Amino acid sequence: IYIPFAQAIPNVAVIDPEQCIKLKTGKCGLCEKVCSAGAINYKQEDELIEREYGAIVVATGWKPYDVTNLANLGAGKVKNCVTNMQLERLASPFGPTGGKIVRPTDGRRPKRIAFVQCAGSRDQNHLNYCSYICCMATLKQCQYICEQYPETQISVFYIDLRAPGRYVKVLDKVKAAPNVRFIKGKVADVAQAADDNVTVTVEDAIRGEKLHLDYDMVVLATGMQPSLATDSLPLPLPLDEDGFVMGGEEAGIFAAGCARMPLDVMRTAQSGTAAALKAVQTVKGR
C-alpha cells in the first residue's frame, strides 16, 4: 500500500494487486484490520460505466519500455541493474527506502553507478525513435545522487546527449560535477559480476577503445512507449507504427500528451490544455 508518486491525483494510497497477499492468495487481510479509517475494501471490483459525450480527450499516457525485451542489457535479470523508473521510486520519499538510493540486493550505498542511455530507444529492433525525456531524467537523477552521496562516482554512457532549449543549463551543471563522467558509446552488454556487482561492456566512440567496467549499480534509461502500443481502446483511433495517435479530430476525439508523441511534463500540460480547448470548441459548435 503506497501513494504512487508525490503529485498523484487523487493524492491517496493504493493497493498494489501484484504484491498484496490478500488479493493474490485470499489470506492475510491484516491491513484492513489495522486501518482505523476503514479505507481498505478487498471486495471492491471493477465497474463498467456507460456515458455519452460530445467529445473525448485521449490522454492515455505512456509506460516504460519492457526491459525484459533487452536481452543484451540483462533483460531485467541482472541484480542491482534497475530502470530509471525504479531509481525514481528509490529516490522518492514515498518509496520503499524512504528516499535513500541504495542497492536493492543488500541496501548498501553504491560507490560506483552507471547510467545506460537509450535503453530500447533509437533502436530499429525496439523503439525506433528518441524518447525525448531520458537524457533529462538521467541528468536529474545524477543530481539526486551527487546531493545524497557527493563521493559516489557516476558514469553516463550515451549515443547523443539531448537537452532541448534552456535545459542545456542543467547539462552544463552536471558536466561540471567532478564525480560525473560522460562516455560516448552504445553499451553492448550488461552482465552480472562478483559480489552482485554489474559489468558494463561498451566501446568508447571517442577513444576507439572497448571497455569492461564494473559498477555497484547500473541504471537503464528505458524508453517511453505510448500506452496504446500495447493497450487498445474501443475508439476509432488511427495509430502510427509506434502506437502514437495520428488524427481522430473529425470524430470528436483529441489526443493529448504522450498519446501523441514523447513529451516532457511542461509540453504535456500544454498539449492537454490545447486538446481540452479543441474539445470544448467542438461541443459548442454543434
Show where each model-derived region lies:
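Residues forming the flavin
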Residues: I1-R286
